[in-house]
Every structure is written in structure tokens, then in C-alpha cells.
From Swiss-Prot:
Residues 67-340 form the Dynamin-type G domain. It comes from Homo sapiens. The gene is MX1. Homotetramer. Oligomerizes into multimeric filamentous or ring-like structures by virtue of its stalk domain. Oligomerization is critical for GTPase activity, protein stability, and recognition of viral target structures. Interacts with TRPC1, TRPC3, TRPC4, TRPC5, TRPC6 and TRPC7. Interacts with HSPA5. Interacts with DDX39A and DDX39B. Interacts with TUBB/TUBB5. The GTP-bound form interacts (via C-terminus) with THOV P5 protein. The GTP-bound form interacts with LACV protein N. Interacts with CCHFV protein N. Changing K83M: Loss of GTP-binding. Loss of protection against viral infection. GO terms for cellular component: cytoplasm; cytosol; endoplasmic reticulum membrane; microtubule; nuclear membrane; nucleus; perinuclear region of cytoplasm; plasma membrane. Residues 366-533 are annotated as: Middle domain. This is Interferon-induced GTP-binding protein Mx1. Residues 279-282 are annotated as: G5 motif. Residues 341-366 are annotated as: Bundle signaling element (BSE). Residues 247-250 are annotated as: G4 motif.
């Protein structure tokens, strides 16, 4: 269940219009009428707000953001826009300051409001390092140390996160991501491409639909010229997820105050989430060591007494406490909207990573006996896939075709070749029969069939099929070889020595079986030079041919033997030979069209597959080669480890989402 926006609105103490309640001033609550009701509101607020933020923070701590975008507020601004001052005012601690690039790594600022404690606690964590801080004055030093460790001690930047957690009664419940200030040109010892690098880092965050961009802009500049707002508009042209923060209102030129008011009231550059205006410590106040709490008091007095800006204070659009309330409310609403989609994304990604991890198998055992069993499993899986190919039962994708189906297609083409061969022969019989009759006729009287003429024609037509049969053998062999190689890739791809060994055996056995298959095919065609058919079979075929011709004669669609019409005796002899040829062709084509595919299947699928399976099993005989055969590609174990880490993160994320009390 996800916390609804209505629930958040009901529980939001901002509705009570007591900014100090956010900062934990219990005495003010006691003095105000209706303080009990307000305290109840605070309690409800804590029950709903903190779990939402903690959930997202815990997912970010797990590293889920490496896999999916999480709801966040990213703070961006040009250099010297007052971005650091705003974050200091919200967090109550001093952050790194100075000239040039101060924020050199994304800083995740986790603020946690303590209700019944006065003790301040802090923690800085990055990479595998973590340090607890008990004094707020130590924060700046630790952040600088973290940035130097990650990005070096120069002026470079890094995409690696630093996390600063602050728990205090004086901070709001809020998590922000502070990004480096935008710079246009490199100065001093900054890298020449520093501006491009910073913009790339910022875009990485703000282009995500899950990110609210908090754009910090000085009040004394033309808002349309600021790089930060321009970048936000580029990725969020409708301004749906952008909040504008105006700073330095005390530096606004006289006579331009009304323009600033128009900006804050969303009349100049429209943003759906609107604008806020704040006054933080100036440089002189920092040098004078003005405390942050005192700065908040001065800010309130400034807006209360300002002739133009006091209305903005009354409208809840001014001061840091109002900003804190707005940001917390926006973040919680944003999280609530994002949670259902986030849960689905985590589920889908978890499933995809699980499937991908299965392709990489399990880690290779260290123990020699375990290696043997591991290799046995691998070889057995390979052999089972080969058996499935041999039996035409392999699993294929929606767009793929089984090997046996493709072989059937080749065998069907072979039948067509045979049919076309005989049909083409029938077309030219009228010329050849007369030639053979004149060449081979012996003592027989006209009208008698010359057997040698018949035999010679049969032999020539069948002999013409020998090379197409051998061509089909080579075609099928390549198809089977590729299919077997694909099985090797599927099972052994990550083990390059095992895959290479399997490929070598696939090739060696292919060559041997192809030679044997071709030898038997050519032997078959040698046997086909013996003109033979069982008597009863041949008589039946001849009878059918004659019956068909009689039927065609009745329909006056008899064959045209134009060249032989001058002699009725010759016509009779030629018709007789033609009938015998037709009868023999029918029976021979049945024999050849089935027998040649049988030979090919036997040698190039069944025996080929069986010999390959035996050869792979023989690998198990030499224990000394186990380690060599199971040597993985250099990136395989790294990829498996990476996927396991992702899967572990996503598994924990799913568990935490399932346990979320909302």
C-alpha cells in the first residue's frame, strides 16, 4: 500500500502555518492555541513522512540507483548562485566553500528530524569508508577529505556519490542531492573540459523523470540568462518537475523588486511547482561567524520588514523554513506517485537479471572432484541438446525453425529436382528416342522395343541426379554443423577451451561423416546404373501409365510425337518405349527421393551426433585437463559477480518494498 497524497496533505504540519514546528520548537507549540491538535498533526506527519524518505534512502544506500532511477530532489545552480548557502541553511551545518568548483562529487544530503532527542549526529560515507561525526563543525573537513579521496586533490570532478547523513531536531525530514555548480570556462588548474563534464554529470540526474530539479538562481540576475534554469528547461520543457529558488534578495537593485516578486509569483518563467525566495548568510556574515540559527531570525525579519517581499512571506513563498516544508511535501508526494512504478520496475529488472545470470551459470568449483561433476553436468547438457536436435525436439524461439524442419525443406527440394529432371527428360524424348533407335536398333522388326535404347536413356537421366545429390549432402552438412556449433556456444561459450575443443571435434567428425556419406551416395548411383525393379511393382506401374494414356486418347489429348507420324510402326515402337520410361521413372524416383535423404540423415545427423556425443564424453577420461577445459573467459566471472550483486540489491529492494508500512 502506498501513502496517498491526501494522507500527506492531512498530516502536513505546514497547513498549521507554524514554520518553527518543523524545526522542533516544542515551547512555541505549547504557547500556541490548539497545540495538542498540532502535535497530533506532527505525530501523523512523522509516521507517514519519515518511512517514505527512509525507504528511498535505504534503496539508494543499497545501490539500487545503479539499476533504476529513484525519486529525488537534485539541487543545481550556477557558480556563486548561493546554492551552498541554501543547503547550509537547510542542514544547519557548514559545507565546503571557496572559489572555483567547491562541490566536486554528487553529495546526497540526508536530513532526519529527531523528535525526542537533542543530540546532533552526523555520518559521512563514500566508497567503502564511513565515519561517524559528533560535532557539526567537522562536516566541512570530512566532505573535503571525501572529495579529495574520490576526485583527487586537484579541481577534477567525479560521478561517485558522497553521502552526508544528519540527524537533529533542527532539520527537516528531507533528502537532497547536491550537484557541482555550473561553470562556463575553466580557470586556474581546472581541466579544460570542466564545463562539459559538470553539465554531463548534472544531466545524468535531472534528465530522469524521477528527479525534481531544485534550481537556485540569484535574485539580482536576469532569470532567463541562467544556465541552470536553461538546463532544467531542456529536460523538463513543461516545468512539471522543476522548482525555482531565488537567493540574495538583499542584493536586488532598487526599482527592480517588483520584477523579482513577479518571478516568485510564477508570472515570468512559469514552473508548475512554482518558486520560493530565501535570504541566507552573506559572505560578510560568514566571516563574522554568524550562526545559522541567527541567520534564520535575520531572514525572517528581513522579509517581514521588506516593502515588496513581505507579501511573499505571507503567501508562504519566502524563508528557509517555508522552503524546507515545501521541499519535504514535494518529495513525499513525488515518492508516493513513484512507488507503484518503482515496484514494477524493480520486479521486471529482477526477473531480467535472473534470466541473464542463468546464461552465465554458477561459479566454477575449486575442488577437483567438484570440477569433475561440474564438467559432467556441462557435457551432459551439451549431449542432451544434441539428442534433441537429432530427434527434432529442440526448443526454438518464436522466429526460429527447428533443424529437422529445415532438413525436410532441403529433402523436399530434392524431390522437386528429381521430378524436374524426369519432366525435362520427357520433353526431349521425341528427339532422343529416334536417335537411340537409329543408333542401337538390332535385328528386331519394326514395332518391337529396343531394350538397349530404354536402358541407355534411363541410366543417363538417373546419372544426372548424382551431383545434385552430393550438393544436397554438403548443404545439409553445413546446416547440421552450424546447429551443433550453436549448441556448443550455448553450453560452452564462457569456457573458451571447452568450446574450442568441441568445435574441433564437430569439424573433425563432420569431415569424416561427410566422406562416408558421399561415398555411399555415389555407390547408390552406381547401383542405379543397374536397371532393376521388382516384376510385380514394375507391371503395376506400367499398367497405370498405359491406362492413363488410353484415358487421354479418349479425351483426344494424346502425346505429340510429330517427328514420328510418318511411320505408324515407328510411332508404335516409340510410344512403347515412352510408356516403359514413364513407368520406370516413377518407381526409380520413389526410391532415389527417399533413399538419398536416408543416407544423409544417417551419416550427417544421427551418426554425426552420436560420434560427437561419444567424443565429448571421452573428455571426462583425462582429469588433468579439467582446469584447462573449465577456464573461463576473462570477463565471465566479473560479469557473473556483477549480475549477482545487482540481483542481491534488487532482491533486498523488493523485500524492503514488501515490508513498507504505507
Amino acid at each position: 500500500m502506498v501513502v496517498s497524497e491526501v494522507d500527506i496533505a492531512k498530516a502536513d504540519p505546514a497547513a498549521a502555518s507554524h514554520p518553527l514546528l518543523l524545526n522542533g520548537d516544542a515551547t512555541v507549540a505549547q504557547k500556541n492555541p490548539g497545540s495538542v491538535a498540532e502535535n497530533n498533526l506532527c505525530s501523523q506527519y512523522e509516521e507517514k513522512v519519515r518511512p517514505c524518505i527512509d525507504l528511498i534512502d535505504s534503496l539508494r544506500a543499497l545501490g539500487v540507483e545503479q539499476d533504476l532511477a529513484l525519486p529525488a530532489i537534485a539541487v543545481i545552480g550556477d557558480q556563486s548562485s548561493g546554492k551552498s548557502s541554501v543547503l547550509e541553511a537547510l542542514s544547519g551545518v557548514a559545507l565546503p566553500r571557496g572559489s572555483g568548483i567547491v562541490t566536486r562529487c554528487p553529495l546526497v544530503l540526508k536530513l532526519k528530524k529527531l523528535v525526542n532527542e537533542d543530540k546532533w549526529r552526523g555520518k559521512v560515507s563514500y566508497q567503502d569508508y564511513e565515519i561517524e561525526i559528533s560535532d557539526a563543525s567537522e562536516v566541512e573537513k570530512e566532505i573535503n577529505k571525501a572529495q579529495n579521496a574520490i576526485a583527487g586533490e586537484g579541481m577534477g570532478i567525479s560521478h561517485e556519490l558522497i553521502t552526508l547523513e544528519i540527524s537533529s531536531r533542527d532539520v527537516p525530514d528531507l533528502t537532497l542531492i547536491d550537484l557541482p555548480g555550473i561553470t562556463r570556462v575553466a580557470v586556474g588548474n581546472q581541466p579544460a573540459d570542466i564545463g562539459y563534464k559538470i553539465k554531463t554529470l548534472i544531466k545524468k540526474y535531472i534528465q530522469r523523470q524521477e528527479t525534481i530539479s531544485l534550481v537556485v538562481v540569484p535574485s539580482n540576475v536576469d532569470i532567463a540568462t541562467t544556465e541552470a534554469l536553461s538546463m532544467a528547461q531542456e529536460v523538463d520543457p513543461e516545468g512539471d518537475r522543476t522548482i525555482g529558488i531565488l537567493t540574495k534578495p538583499d542584493l536586488v537593485d532598487k526599482g527592480t523588486e517588483d520584477k523579482v516578486v513577479d518571478v516568485v509569483r510564477n508570472l515570468v518563467f512559469h514552473l508548475k511547482k512554482g518558486y520560493m525566495i530565501v535570504k541566507c548568510r552573506g559572505q560578510q556574515e560568514i566571516q563574522d561567524q554568524l550562526s545559522l540559527s541567527e541567520a534564520l531570525q535575520r531572514e525572517k525579519i528581513f522579509f517581514e520588514n521588506h516593502p515588496y517581499f513581505r507579501d511573499l512571506l505571507e503567501e508562504g513563498k519566502a524563508t528557509v523554513p517555508c522552503l524546507a516544508e515545501k521541499l519535504t511535501s514535494e518529495l513525499i508526494t513525488h515518492i508516493c506517485k513513484s512507488l507503484p512504478l518503482l515496484e514494477n520496475q524493480i520486479k521486471e529488472t529482477h526477473q531480467r537479471i535472473t534470466e541473464e545470470l542463468q546464461k552465465y551459470g554458477v561459479d566454477i568449483p575449486e575442488d577437483e572432484n567438484e570440477k569433475m561433476f561440474f564438467l559432467i553436468d556441462k557435457v551432459n547438457a551439451f549431449n542432451q541438446d544434441i539428442t534433441a536436435l537429432m530427434q527434432g525436439e529442440e526448443t526454438v524461439g518464436e522466429e526460429d525453425i527447428r533443424l529437422f524442419t529445415r532438413l525436410r525443406h532441403e529433402f523436399h527440394k530434392w524431390s522437386t529436382i528429381i521430378e524436374n529432371n524426369f519432366q525435362e527428360g520427357h520433353k526431349i524424348l521425341s528427339r532422343k528416342i529416334q536417335k537411340f533407335e537409329n543408333q542401337y536398333r538390332g535385328r528386331e522388326l519394326p514395332g518391337f522395343v529396343n531394350y538397349r535404347t530404354f536402358e541407355t536413356i534411363v541410366k543417363q537421366q538417373i546419372k544426372a541426379l548424382e551431383e545434385p545429390a552430393v550438393d544436397m549432402l554438403h548443404t545439409v552438412t553445413d546446416m547440421v554443423r552450424l546447429a551443433f556449433t550453436d549448441v556448443s556456444i550455448k553450453n560452452f561459450e564462457e569456457f573458451f577451451n571447452l568450446h574450442r575443443t568441441a568445435k574441433s571435434k564437430i569439424e573433425d567428425i563432420r569431415a569424416e561423416q561427410e566422406r562416408e556419406g558421399e561415398k555411399l551416395i555415389r555407390l547408390h548411383f552406381q547401383m542405379e546404373q543397374i536397371v532393376y525393379c521388382q516384376d510385380q511393382v514394375y507391371r503395376g506401374a506400367l499398367q497405370k501409365v498405359r491406362e492413363k494414356e488410353l484415358e487421354e486418347e479418349k479425351k483426344k489429348k494424346s502425346w505429340d510425337f510429330g517427328a514420328f507420324q510418318s511411320s505408324s510402326a515407328t510411332d508404335s515402337s516409340m510410344e512403347e518405349i515412352f510408356q516403359h520410361l514413364m513407368a520406370y521413372h516413377q518407381e526409380a524416383s520413389k526410391r532415389i527421393s527417399s533413399h538419398i535423404p536416408l543416407i544423409i540423415q544417417f551419416f550427417m545427423l544421427q551418426t554425426y551426433g552420436q560420434q560427437l556425443q561419444k567424443a565429448m564424453l571421452q573428455l571426462l577420461q583425462d582429469k588433468d585437463t579439467y582446469s584447462w577445459l573449465l577456464k573461463e573467459r576473462s570477463d565471465t566471472s566479473d560479469k557473473r559477480k556483477f549480475l549477482k550483486e545487482r540481483l542481491a540489491r534488487l532482491t533486498q529492494a523488493r523485500r524492503r518494498l514488501a515490508q513498507f508500512p504505507g
